[in-house]
Amino acid sequence: MKTLFLLAILALVASTTFAQYSVGGGYNDVGGGGGSQQCPQERPNLGSCKDYVMERCFTMKDFPLTWPTKWWKGGCEQEVREKCCQQLSQIAPQCRCDAIRGVIQGKLGGIFGIGGGDVFKQIQRAQILPSKCNMGADCKFPSGYYW
């Protein structure tokens, strides 16, 4: 019974993903990123932004530990955010929201996007990255758009 349930959920996730790509459009149609035609096709390196959104720390002082770790109050949140802001500053303003969405796409919520994380909180963290970095207004991803 569990296997059947897991297969049904996996099929639902796969069909949703397929429908998302076959329908077309994207969050830029809703607003909050705009101008994706002028943006480069390749995804910029925003690894620190992904770590910031997912609340992970990767620093040299954690070198022997290679697995992602949750940060703690007073830990490395500020360091990761500063690296993220530095990476975002190298992207054209009209392309930032598209780049942020692209870097976290498929990374939310654990395995296959099911459980394992607070997806709503992570999406909110991604949307407010530009204002956290003093780079303009927040991104606006469509509601219910969980990749």
Curated annotation (Swiss-Prot):
**Claim: Secreted is one of the keywords in the record:** yes
Q: Which Pfam families match?
A: Tryp_alpha_amyl
Which biological process annotations from GO are given for this protein?
defense response to bacterium
Tell where it localizes. Answer: Membrane; Secreted, Extracellular space
Q: Which UniProt keywords apply?
A: Antibiotic, Antimicrobial, Disulfide bond, Membrane, Plant defense, Secreted, Signal, Toxin
Q: Which residues form the signal peptide?
A: 1-19
Q: Which InterPro entries match?
A: Allergen/soft/tryp_amyl_inhib (IPR006106), Bifun_inhib/LTP/seed_sf (IPR036312), Bifunc_inhib/LTP/seed_store (IPR016140), Glia_glutenin (IPR001954)
Tell me what PTMs the record reports for this protein.
Five disulfide bonds are present.
Maturation-removed propeptide residues? 20-28
Question: Which GO terms of the cellular component aspect does the record hold?
Answer: extracellular region; membrane
Which GO molecular function terms does the record list?
nutrient reservoir activity; serine-type endopeptidase inhibitor activity; toxin activity
Describe tissue expression: Found in endosperm and aleurone layer of developing kernels, but not in the embryo.
Q: What is its main location?
A: membrane
In terms of Gene3D superfamilies, this protein maps to: Plant lipid-transfer and hydrophobic proteins
Highest taxon above the source species? Eukaryota
Q: What does this protein do?
A: Acts as a membranotoxin, probably through its antibacterial and antifungal activities, contributing to the defense mechanism of the plant against predators. Forms monovalent cation-selective ion channels in membranes. Contributes to grain texture and hardness.
Protein name, as recorded: Hordoindoline-B1
